[in-house]
Amino acid sequence: MLIPRKVKHRKQHHPKRSGVAKGGTRVVFGEYGIQALEPAYVTNRQIESARIAMTRHIRRGGKVWITIFPDRPLTKKPAETRMGSGKGSPEWWVANVKPGRVMFELAGVPEPVAREALRRAMHKLPMKCRFVRREVEVS
C-alpha cells in the first residue's frame, strides 16, 4: 500500500475537490494514460487495485507509472460515538484528484492491450475517466 513514511501533522483538513488540475494533465512518462473527468478522493487501496488490474492484463510486457500519491489522511470517528471530544483518528490515506489529472501511465505494449488494461483499471476507480494518448510535439 502507498502511504507517506513520515508526516508533519497526523490529522489535516479535508482538501477542496472543486476546480481543475493545474499540473499533471499530460502523458509524460508512458505512451498511454488514464485521465480523470470528475473530482474524487482516490484511496491507497483503489490505487493498488487498479495497478494490479493493469499489470495482470499486460503480464510481463509493459511498464506502469503511477503519477498520484495518497498524501492526505482522512479521519473517522468510531461508530456510535457521541459528538465532540476532538477529531477522529486517521482511517485511510487519499489522493485528491481533480478533473484533467493523469493518474496512471503505460508504455511498451500495443494500443489495444493498453486500452483494455487501462479500462480494467478505470473500473477500480471512484470517478469517470478516459483513455488518453501521448501528444506528439511537432517542431
From Swiss-Prot:
Disulfide bond positions: none
HAMAP family xrefs: Ribosomal_uL16 (MF_01342)
Record-given protein name: Large ribosomal subunit protein uL16
A molecular-function term among this protein's GO annotations: structural constituent of ribosome
Cellular component terms (Gene Ontology): cytosolic large ribosomal subunit
Gene3D superfamilies linked to this entry: Ribosomal protein L10e/L16
PANTHER family recorded: 50S/60S RIBOSOMAL PROTEIN L16, LARGE RIBOSOMAL SUBUNIT PROTEIN UL16M
Record has Ribonucleoprotein as a keyword: yes
Top-level taxon of the source organism: Bacteria
Family assignment from sequence similarity: Belongs to the universal ribosomal protein uL16 family.
Region (Disordered): 1-22
SUPFAM superfamilies linked: Ribosomal protein L16p/L10e (SSF54686)
Subunit structure: Part of the 50S ribosomal subunit.
PROSITE patterns: RIBOSOMAL_L16_2 (PS00701)
Record field: compositional bias (Basic residues): 1-19
Organism this protein belongs to: Acidothermus cellulolyticus (strain ATCC 43068 / DSM 8971 / 11B)
Key words, A-Z: Ribonucleoprotein, Ribosomal protein, RNA-binding, rRNA-binding, tRNA-binding
Function: Binds 23S rRNA and is also seen to make contacts with the A and possibly P site tRNAs.
Biological process terms in GO annotation: translation
